[in-house]
Amino acid sequence: MKTKHRFSTQFFLLIILFFSFNASAKETKIPFKKWWIPQGIEIFKKAYPDIQFIPTYDKEAEDWLVTIIVCDAKNPQKKHQEDLYWCDSKFLPKDKLDQKDNYRPLLYNYSFTVPDPNTFTEQDIQLIKEFTDRDNRKNSPIDPPFFYDLVYDCTNRESTERHIVSIPFLTLNINVHERIKEPLERVSKKIMALPRDEEMTKFLSTLTRTDGYAWRTVRDTQSRSFHSRGLAIDILPKNYYQRIIYWSWQKQLRPDDWYMTEISKRWAPPKKVIEIFKEEGFIWGGTWIVWDNMHFEYHPELLVD
């Protein structure tokens, strides 16, 4: 799973042509949506093949109501089911539809390339400053929790911790949600099987900590961290090779221009390690504008072909 999901140009042209041959957008709105299931729902079906997604168009809400059926992680014969509205990949319950602007979509174009500060324009810099402003982050839309709460049974701390398991990972152990136990074990096995060249030898021999489950929110936001679901891991090497590893720590040292930190001055795992994580459905935080180079999250929906 390597490429970004995005609507094709042909698809947009088809939409334009469809509406251009109809006299009223109001007359065509419901029939069009009734027969055209959003591409994003198909992305989730591919990303989570063991989960059922049954979409039905709700004329009153003018949106797709998706029945999601999940097998219990501990007892596959037991099923959990919930109806959530698609709402541009926010997966909201009916009583949250009037608050949809408070949530951001779960699907976005994940970048595989680290943004190079040498290419930033003045406009880019202004946007970065606004995005990372503490007040803006506190008051910005949050990640909707409803889909993940259903899939991982992690509505609260007690329910989450019923599913946390400890597994060997690389040269250490880590606590994660049991649903990602197998993909993470495959990651570990593939990495340990890589040829021990100088880069890999240094990477494995200097690995001092791997952090998984931790109950917390994302820094400066109201969104739950993926660590609090047991779906994220941090890989920390000894002394970070004397490099920078996390945007917020750098911002404390250089509050006025932290975003201009050269890529060469940031620690990063070997590219082959990042690639193995991607193969198993994990995104790397090093390509975010708010780069978190130690961080990996399980998001197979962002990596679907």
Residue ranges and their predicted role:
Residues 45-46, 50-136:
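Solvent-exposed N-terminal domain segments of exported/luminal and surface proteins
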Residues 20-22:
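N-terminal signal peptide c-region/cleavage motif recognized by signal peptidases
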Residues 199-216:
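Acidic, glycine-rich low-complexity/disordered segments
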